[in-house]
Each structure stands twice: as structure tokens, then as C-alpha cells.
Amino acid sequence: TKNFLPHMVEQGQGHIVNVASVGASFGVPGVASYCATKFAMLGFSEGLKHELSGTGVDVTVVSPIMVDTPLFDHPSFENFSKRSTIAILSPEKVANTILKAANSSKLEIVVPSVARAGIWAKHNFPFFINPIIGNAFRKQLTKRTSKK
């Protein structure tokens, strides 16, 4: 962004697409640092979108729920995908969404779109959703640390 943005503004056109995660909306036990980086990317993208208003340069952040990458090999995610009821997205699906995002005026595109309901529920009913998320991941974290 630092290298290309001045040229985009000079030309009066361009689109920056950043990738975060649905984890930007949920602080999750055991992967707090991961969630923090995603919170940061979403905040950076939102601030930059406001700063660039009227320049012809836009910003969109793509937030996939879970992508089939080596990240799931990390101990923090041990057995998570096996017990998850949420479909894990292919990298190709996310890549296609990133390409489409370059033509979108939205700040954030959540993939799959049904995950937006979880984000909405978390923001509107945190007293209900936060304990569910916390307990589910805490159980996983306890299992992992008790194996050591």
C-alpha cells in the first residue's frame, strides 16, 4: 500500500483489497494474536477508506471465515476443522472473492456471506454470543494444553 498508493491517488483511480478474517470480529481464546492482527487489518482498511474518500481510490477488505491453508496445521487449530460444522473454504473461492472485491464499493466482504449473521449477532447480542465462542474455544484450548 505504501508504495502504490501515491501513484493510485495521482492517477485518481485504484482499489486496494486487503484480506482479514471473520476473526476480526471475534476475540477467540488460544488465537488472540491472530484475531488481533485481523482486527488491525479491518481498522486500517476502514481508516484508509475514509482518508481516500474523494480521491478515486477505494478500499475493500475480504474477511473469509476459514480457508484451507497450512494455518490449520498450527497447534492452536488442532482438531478444530474436524469438529467444525462450518465449511472450510478453498483458497480458490477466496481468490475469486478477492478479484470481485476490486470492483466493489463495500468496506468489507464476508465469505461466505452467511457468516455475516454471526458477526451481526456478536455485535447486537454479545452477552449471548461471547460466552458461546469463549466456551467452545476454551474447551479446545484446555484439551490441547492437558495433552502436554
Language model segments and positions:
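Residue(s) in the substrate-gating loop at a strand-loop-helix junction
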Residues: S21
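Active-site loop immediately N-terminal to the catalytic Tyr-X3-Lys motif
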Residues: V28-A32
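Active-site helix of classical SDR
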Residues: T1, T37
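A short helix-coil junction within the Rossmann-fold of NAD(P)-dependent oxidoreductases
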Residues: N3-G12
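SDR active-site lid
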Residues: G54-S113
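Alpha-helical segment proximal to the catalytic Tyr-Lys
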Residues: P6, H50-S53
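Conserved active-site helix of classical SDR/Rossmann-fold NAD(P)-dependent CH-OH oxidoreductases
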Residues: F39-E46, H50, V57, N96
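Conserved catalytic-site region of short-chain dehydrogenase/reductase
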Residues: A24-F26
